[in-house]
Amino acid sequence: MEQLTKNQAVATSQEAVQNQNEPQLRDENAHNDKSVHGVLNPTYQAGLRRDAVQPDIEAERKKRDEIEAGKSYCSRRFGGATCDDKSAQIYARFDKNDWRIQPAEFYRFHDAEVNTFGYF
C-alpha cells in the first residue's frame, strides 16, 4: 500500500514538472489582445509598425512639400529659372515677403571662379 502511494506521488510530481514545461493555455476570460503564448497579436504588431513608421512618412512628406515650395519660389524670384532640390529646400525657408537681398552664404554658386577663389 505504501508502495502505491509512493508511485502516485512520483507520478504526480512528474506531471507537475511536465505541466511547467508546457505553454500555458490562454484564459478565455482574459482580454489581453497584445499577446497569446508570448506571440504578439498581428493587429497589435501592425499598430506598432505603423506608429514607428508614421514620423518617417510625415518627415518625408514635409521635406517634399518644402522642396516643391522652394522650387516655386525660385521660379518666381529668378524669372522662371529652376533650382536643384538642395537650393529649393534652402529657399523654402526664406521669408517670402522679405524681398531684401539675402546673405551670399545662402546662395549656391556653380561658377568655377567663385568656387576657386572663394569670394564668399
UniProtKB/Swiss-Prot annotation:
Keyword vocabulary terms for this entry: Autocatalytic cleavage, Host cytoplasm, Hydrolase, Protease, Viral capsid assembly, Viral release from host cell
Record's subcellular location: Host cytoplasm
Subunit organization: Component of the procapsid complex composed of 60 copies of the internally located B, 240 copies of the external scaffolding protein D, 60 copies of each of the viral structural proteins F and G proteins, and 12 copies of H.
GO biological process, one term: proteolysis
Biased amino acid composition, Polar residues: 1-23
EC number: 3.4.-.-
Biased composition (Basic and acidic residues): 24-36, 48-64
Protein's organism: Enterobacteria phage phiX174 (Isolate Sanger)
Marked site: Cleavage: R77, F78, R93, F94, R108, F109
Domain of life according to the entry: Viruses
Function summary: Participates in the assembly of the viral procapsid in the cytoplasm. Forms first a 12S pre-assembly complex with protein H, and F and G pentamers, then twelve 12S complexes are joined by the D protein to form the procapsid. Internal scaffold protein B is released from the procapsid upon genome packaging. Autoproteolytic activity cleaves protein B and probably facilitates its removal through the pores of the procapsid.
Recorded family membership: Belongs to the microviridae B protein family.
A Pfam family annotated for this UniProt entry: Phage_B
Enzymatic class: hydrolase
Protein name (Swiss-Prot/TrEMBL): Internal scaffolding protein B
One GO CC term on file: viral scaffold
GO terms, molecular function: peptidase activity
Region annotated Disordered, chain positions: 1-64
Lineage: Viruses, Monodnaviria, Sangervirae, Phixviricota, Malgrandaviricetes
PTM field: The proteolytic cleavage of the internal scaffolding protein B releases the scaffold protein in order to continue virion assembly.
